[in-house]
Amino acid sequence: MTSSIDEKFEEWTCGRRAVEARVAVFEKIRDIPYAVAPGINSALHYARILTVGKGSCTPKHFLLRDMYEKLGLPVLYVVYPFRWSDLEVDYPAHLRKLAEAMPVSHHLACRVEIGGRLVLVDATVDSPLKRLGLP
């Protein structure tokens, strides 16, 4: 597991200055397509996101923490409750009904110490989802 993380870290950061490396890691993880993949949603198996090529907030932020800590950045996890029906997304009628029936879910992101401040860093929403209106 660690070797695949180390390889990607080297690929994404090699030859970059600290800020450029931090941004590159964020963008590469953010651009992994969002998908719920239960087999990689644990602290033991999250690195599989690199071979599966998709994942939800949980493996994305476990990976982000690993890589940011390699850059010397302290990272904390943050968990937010949310409801799918509260998102300002124009769901088709059948999906709106499903979203309204869903219980409260939990979202994982990170707070990263940058310049002495804890900054919220959320790499969940890839570009196609952003175009749909997800935050």
Task: Give the residues covered by each predicted segment.
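Secondary-structure boundary elements
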Residues: 1-55
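Generic serine detector
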Residues: 3-4, 42, 56, 85, ...
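Alpha-helix N-cap/loop-to-helix boundary motif
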Residues: 49, 53-56, 98, 102-104
